[in-house]
Amino acid sequence: MDKLLVGLSVLFANVKALFYKVAYAGRVRAELIVASPYFPSVRVRNGGMIACARVKFRRRCSIFADGGVVDIGRGTFLNNDCSINSNQSIVIGENTLLGEGVKIYDHNHRVIDGVVSHSEFDSAPVSIGKDCWIGSNVVILPGVSICEKVIIGSGSVVTKSITTPGVYVTENVKLKKIN
């Protein structure tokens, strides 16, 4: 019975992927054989596009491409409650793991004369290399580039690019390399 339920869940996820491909007229590119019974909440607007291949999702993940491009590499895993929000470009390399609650943004609300704009944004591309592990509740902000084979500890806020493989954690409100 469990195998039947899993099979039906995977079938439903593939139907959902097909629906997104049709509804968004080619702006969502996903292989129809989704590797998990879950498929994320998706929003594509203003010429945005989402591409993913053999990506495994857990529950309550969301991907928004509001004029931006989201490209998730083959074999990547997104745990529960991950959010990817793009106005420009977010690229995640192959075989990368995202822990629960990871948030990735390539834009911030623009602040004009001390007032936060609801409709204007400052954007910069984000890239994460292949074979990375992004720990639970990590936030990755605009303009960050992370090289391959990087581990980022839980709860870290990444505001600067990482160019050397290793393990990184936030310490005293600064991201510090620990090995």
Model segments located where?
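A generic "structured core" feature
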Residues: 141-142, 146-157
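Short helix N-cap motif at coil->helix boundaries in the Bergerat
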Residues: 160
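Extracellular/periplasm-exposed beta-strand and loop segments of Gram-negative cell-envelope proteins
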Residues: 108-109
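Domain-scale signature associated with acetyltransferase and cell-envelope carbohydrate enzymes
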Residues: 1-105, 129-130, 138-140, 148, ...
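Glycine-rich NAD(P)-binding loop of Rossmann-like domains
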Residues: 116-128
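Nucleic acid-binding interface residues in structured DNA/RNA-binding domains
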Residues: 169-171
